[in-house]
Regions:
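Residues at the starts of beta-strands that form the adenosine-phosphate
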Residues: 5, 49-51, 103, 135
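Conserved SAM-binding loop
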Residues: 26, 53, 106
Length: 157
C-alpha cells in the first residue's frame, strides 16, 4: 500500500450567490478561470491518478470535455445536490457514490494557490502517514487572532 491510487474529487457548483459564474469566468489571465486553473493543477500533479469533476454546470462540463484528458471523469450532478442548501454530509455521500473505493483527495476550485507541486507533496505526506496507521490527512491554517464567543475569550486568557 505504499502508493495507493489517488482520485481527486472536485465539486464545482453552478450558481454562486455572490459572484455569478465564479468558477468559469475569466480570472488571472485564464479564459476559463478557476476551473481551468484547478484542472491544470490536478492534471499536472503526478500523484493524482483520476479527477472526478462533479458539477451541475454544463459550461464547466463542456470545458472539461474540451481538454480531452483521460484523468478527468466528468459527472453531471443532480440539482438536488447542487443547491447552496446542500449539506456537506450529502456531498460526502455523493463523492463516495462516485468513488466507492480507493483514496480520495477532496479539493475545490476556489483554492487556486494549491498547485501541482503542493498536491504531490501533500499526497506523499499522506502515503507516509498511511504507513504509521493514519487514515486521513487534512490541511488547516493556524489562526493568530483572538477568538470570542458569547462567554468571552476562547483561545487566550
Amino acid at each position: 500500500m505504499n502508493n495507493p491510487k489517488i482520485t481527486a474529487f472536485l465539486p464545482c457548483r453552478k450558481g454562486s450567490q455572490r459572484v455569478p459564474k465564479k468558477n468559469i469566468k475569466p480570472f488571472a489571465g485564464f479564459e476559463f478561470g478557476l476551473i481551468q486553473i484547478k484542472l491544470k493543477q490536478l492534471i499536472e500533479a503526478c500523484n493524482v491518478d483520476k479527477i472526478v469533476l462533479s458539477t451541475n454546470d454544463d459550461e464547466i462540463l463542456n470545458y472539461a470535455a474540451s481538454l480531452q484528458n483521460d484523468k478527468i471523469i466528468p459527472h453531471k450532478r443532480v440539482e438536488l445536490l447542487s443547491s447552496s442548501e446542500t449539506s456537506t454530509d450529502d456531498l460526502v455521500a455523493h463523492a463516495l457514490d462516485l468513488i466507492p473505493q480507493g483514496h480520495i483527495l477532496w479539493t475545490h476550485v476556489t483554492s487556486p494557490f494549491v498547485n501541482a507541486q503542493l498536491y504531490d507533496k501533500i499526497i506523499q505526506q499522506y502515503r507516509t502517514a498511511l504507513l504509521d496507521d493514519y487514515d486521513s490527512l487534512m490541511t488547516t491554517n493556524l489562526i493568530h487572532g483572538f477568538l470570542w464567543d458569547e462567554n468571552g475569550p476562547i483561545n487566550y486568557d
